[in-house]
Regions:
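Beta-strand-rich recognition/accessory modules
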Residues: 259-266, 286-289, 485-488, 508-548
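Active-site beta->alpha N-cap acidic-glycine motif
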Residues: 26-99, 285-287, 358
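Catalytic domains of cell-wall/extracellular-matrix polysaccharide-remodeling enzymes
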Residues: 140-215, 469, 473
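Acidic-aromatic substrate-binding/catalytic surfaces of carbohydrate-active enzymes
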Residues: 368-450, 458
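Metal-dependent polysaccharide deacetylase catalytic core of the NodB/CE4 family, i.e.
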Residues: 81-170, 225-252, 281-294
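Acidic, contiguous internal or C-terminal segments within carbohydrate-active enzymes
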Residues: 449-496
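Catalytic grooves of carbohydrate-active enzymes
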Residues: 43-46, 59, 63-66, 153, ...
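Acidic-and-aromatic substrate-binding clefts and catalytic sites of carbohydrate-active enzymes
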Residues: 50-58, 78-90, 111-114, 167-176, ...
């Protein structure tokens, strides 16, 4: 099993070898904020490997702190309960400057916490990583409240205040509601999107940055302020905007223990340069760090590459480095509802011509991917605040937990590993159907909620607007004669698509019926193996992307 990582939230001041306090950081005028959180979470034991002793785990945290201080980078340390009650960690963390470092809670549930809450321990070890034992989804709502009360009371008795930030791979809505309503937490975080890794599936959510969750579903962004929990949930681990989606079960993130990603100097420089310099709508965010279970030897090289880059970017005014609570408080001051955001890549790693944009709003998310001169809309998921998560009132009894939204196009799950499918932009070229071929897209922002991609094709272009509730594609100056979108899937792929009804496509997923409706353009059946085809009207298609 892969050990999970600590958060690093990244902002428009991600790098500076200066002693300026975090709150004094500035971003360059006109730049959207780029926020980095460095988040390390701490476990007290590692029962799966006898060589990873308590001393090894403790020294890992000592080294993390030393490296962060070397580059004058603050951050957040999240304590699992067994580490919270270990006096060595208490004494160590109490020495950290409060204006640069934050102490919060890591919401995995070890034996001492469960038993102090008066609940029988069912685990094999004192820390058991299985979903039904070590996480809130394995306990009833009443048990969750007892567990929360014990943790928060003991945290306050040790540090003198309640934690402001609580994070975990997965947290249910009941627990988050209770933590906010009673203890007023200001920030949370959950795992990146993934399928099945370590028993956790989170798929189709707000892809990066942060969102206000529905009171009924901690993974689902709310559409209305009166239905949302006013605690921003940040997405963890710094996912590669191109490879992490295509390889949904693997790990291509800022985590420094992975030699192809966060432990690779070339990848680190590419990712952080892209993050800091490419266009973003609203703001951009990333998380870095690693849990101590991986040990210092495994993470040392990656962190020693990452930290000076973050410090340099902060000094240049391109990123902000903040604690998780600082980012949460900024988010709440800035946004009354979940904002629209993008993460764009205008230049991939060497030997790849891929470009991409992830767009998120409180109504949907989408991903556009350019490869070999062609365009594919790999992903569209709708959000609906009335759809509860599976664990709002129920528990999981297996070592798996599942959090989904509502898929209209799911290129990863409906394609093949490493080769996502989705809506392909096609044309009739006289000799048959072929992908439209074009140049490099240019990403800009039209306003606070609308991102734009301009894709040159022939003597014309396709102009793509991603708005809060709609996606518009317009052909300017006849870039391609007879063009259309085909929703392609791999042979044998199972999808929730049911049928075309009028000018909409009907879907049913997890007992919820929803649809893709057309404001402009027409839907028709396709004879080439795709689910259906979208044809333009007057050179334009407009997809309505709000679940009604």
């Amino acid at each position: 099993m892969r050990f999970k990582t600590l958060l690093i939230f990244t902002s428009a001041a991600m790098a500076a070898v200066v002693t300026t306090p975090l709150f004094a950081q500035k971003t360059k005028p006109g730049n959207t904020p780029k926020i980095v959180n460095i988040v390390n979470f701490i476990r007290d034991i590692e029962p799966r490997d006898a060589s990873i002793t308590k001393d090894v785990l403790y020294q890992t945290v000592v080294n993390q702190i030393a490296l962060m201080k070397q580059y004058h980078l603050g951050g957040t340390f999240l304590l699992q309960y067994d580490a919270l009650i270990d006096k060595r960690y208490q004494d160590l963390l109490k020495t950290l400057p409060k204006d640069e470092f934050e102490i919060g809670g890591w919401w995995e549930l070890p034996q001492p916490l469960i038993e102090k809450a008066g609940i029988k321990w069912r685990g094999k070890y004192a820390w058991d990583w299985h979903s039904d034992i070590g996480f809130s989804v394995g306990y009833t709502p009443a048990e969750r409240e007892k567990i929360i009360d014990v943790y928060f009371a003991d945290f306050k008795s040790i540090f003198g205040y309640y934690p402001k930030s609580i994070a975990s791979w997965v947290i249910d809505a009941h627990s988050l509601n209770y933590m906010y309503d009673k203890y007023k937490i200001v920030a949370s975080a959950n795992c990146k999107d993934q399928v099945g890794t370590d028993g956790f599936t989170l798929w189709g959510g707000y892809w990066n940055q942060a969102y206000y969750p529905s009171r009924l579903n901690a993974y689902m962004p709310a559409q209305h302020a009166d239905k949302q929990l006013p605690v921003p949930v940040f997405r963890m681990l710094g996912s590669d905007p191109i490879r992490q989606y295509a390889d949904g079960s693997s790990v291509t993130t800022l985590e420094p223990v992975y030699p192809h990603a966060g432990g690779n100097e070339q990848w680190i420089n590419w990712f952080l340069h892209t993050f800091a310099n490419d266009s973003s709508l609203g703001y951009n965010y990333t998380q870095a760090g690693q849990e101590n279970s991986f040990t210092w030897d495994a993470m040392k090289k990656g962190l020693e590459w990452q930290m000076p880059v973050v410090a340099r970017l902060r000094k240049q005014g391109k990123v902000r480095v903040e604690t998780m609570a600082q980012s949460g408080e900024w988010f709440k001051r800035t946004y009354k509802v979940t904002p629209a955001t993008t993460f764009t890549v205008s230049r991939d790693l060497a030997n790849s011509d891929k470009k991409t944009v992830w767009y998120n709003s409180r109504f949907y998310r989408t991903n556009l991917l350019w490869e070999n001169g062609t365009l594919r809309i790999t992903d569209i998921h709708l959000f609906n605040e009335t759809v509860p998560d599976k664990y709002l009132n129920n528990v999981t009894t297996v070592n798996q937990s599942f959090f989904y939204t509502l898929p209209l196009a799911d290129g990863f799950q409906w394609g093949k590993r490493g080769k996502p499918e989705g809506f392909r932009l096609m044309m009739n070229d006289g000799g048959g159907e072929a992908p439209v071929q074009g140049g490099d897209p240019v990403f800009t922002n039209l306003n606070k909620t609308t991102a734009h991609a301009s894709w040159p094709v022939g003597k014309g272009s396709f102009e793509i607007n991603m708005g809060e509730k709609s996606l518009t594609i317009t052909a300017e100056n006849h870039p391609a004669g007879d063009w259309f979108l085909d929703l392609c899937i791999a042979e044998g792929a199972k999808t929730p698509f049911k049928q075309l009804t009028g000018n909409s496509a009907l879907y049913e997923f997890d007992g919820h019926t929803y649809r893709l409706a057309m404001q402009q353009g027409t839907l028709e059946k396709s004879a080439n193996g795709s689910l259906y085809r979208i044809r333009p009207q007057h050179h334009r298609v407009v997809l309505l992307l709000a679940d009604q």
